From Swiss-Prot:
Its cofactor is pyridoxal 5'-phosphate. Pathway: Amino-acid biosynthesis; L-tryptophan biosynthesis; L-tryptophan from chorismate: step 5/5. This is Tryptophan synthase beta chain. The keyword Amino-acid biosynthesis applies. InterPro entries: Trp_synth_b_CS, Trp_synth_beta, Trp_synth_beta/beta-like, TrpB-like_PALP, TrpB-like_PALP_sf. It comes from the Bacteria. Coiled coil: none annotated. Its EC number is 4.2.1.20. The modification N6-(pyridoxal phosphate)lysine is found at residue 86. Pfam families: PALP. It comes from Aliivibrio fischeri (strain ATCC 700601 / ES114).
Amino acid sequence: MAKLDAYFGEYGGQYVPQILVPALEQLEQAFIDAQEDPDFRSEFMTLLQEYAGRPTALTLCRNLTKGTKTKLYLKREDLLHGGAHKTNQVLGQALLAKRMGKDEIIAETGAGQHGVATALACALLGLKCRVYMGAKDVERQSPNVFRMKLMGAEVIPVHSGSATLKDACNEALRDWSATYETAHYLLGTAAGPHPFPTIVREFQRMIGEETKMQILAREGRLPDAVIACVGGGSNAIGMFADFIEEESVKLIGVEPAGKGIDTDQHGAPLKHGKTGIFFGMKAPLMQDEHGQIEESYSVSAGLDFPSVGPQHAHLNAIGRAEYGAVTDDEALDAFKILARNEGIIPALESSHALAYALQLAQAEPEKEQLLVVNLSGRGDKDIFTVHDILKEKGEI
C-alpha cells in the first residue's frame, strides 16, 4: 500500500485517539486511489469549472500602486462560488466521501466560510451535513449561519472553552470518533492529523497552478513574490505549492498581528509560538509557560486560530517561505484602500496579505517588482464588522 509522508520535517504526524487511526488510514488510501483515477479527477475538474467558476481571474490593480514601480496582481478567489477559496477543496473532499460510501459530513467552521462551502457541496452532492461552530462565532457571523441552514446544514453551537474555532474543532473530532463508519470529517484547512494537510493542499493547488500560467501569459515571467494570509494556511499552501520549486519566487505568508505582536492579542504562532501538539498534529502553537493553549485573536474570524499547518511550519524552518504579520488596523486600511481604489471589497483575512504587499510597494517605490496577492475571499461577510469598527473610530 502506497503511503504519503505524514511529516513535513519535524512537523505534522497523527496525534489522535487510537479509534480514529483506521478512519485516517482509510481516508489516506481512498485519496491515493482517487488521485490515480482519471474519472475522479475529471469529475472534480468539471465541478470546479461548471459549478464553482474556475479558473478564477488574475486582476492587475490599476490604481493601488500609483507612485511606485510595483505591479500588483490579485488572484481572485473571491469570485469563486461560495465567496472564497474554501469551495475548491470542499468539493474534492465531498467527492472523496461519496467514493468511500459515506453519506454524512461533519465540519467545523470559524468565520462560517468553510461551513457555507461544506453546506453547498453537501446540497449539491446529496450528503447530510452538520457543522460545529463556536457560540461566539455563531453570533459574529449570523449571515453565514443562515446561509448554511438555507442549504440544509445543521449548525451546532459549541459553548465549551472559549466558544470559538478551536473548540469547534475539538467537538467535530469527538463526533467523528463515534461516527466515522458512516461519516466523513471534512476538515477546513491544511492542518490537523495526517493525511489532512496533504489532501487539502492537493485540492487547493490549482490556485498556484492557474496563477503561474496566467502571470506567464500576462507578463512573460514569474512573479517576484506570491503573498497570502495564513490562519490554518490552506489558501496560502494552495498558492505556494506550485511555486515551491521555483527558487526565484519568494513565498510570503502573513499572520494576524491583531492588536500588536507585543500584546497577548494576536494569532501569529509561526513567529511567536512554541511547538506543541494540537488538533492531531505537531506544530507551532500559541501556549503559555505551562503548555496551555492561549487564545488567539484577530479582527478576522478566519485567521483566529492558535496553530498553523505543518507544511508552513516546515517551509518557515528551512527558510523557503517567509512569514510576516499585519495588525487589525493595517488590514482595515488595506480593506478600505482596495474598496476605494479598485472597487473590490476583500475579506478581512485577505486584507492582511494585501496590506503586506502594499507595505512592500511603499517601502521601495523605485524598485520594479511583480507581486501576486491571493485574494482568498470576498468581504460581504465582514461589512457589518468593519462598519461597527469605523463607527467607533468616528470615521463614518
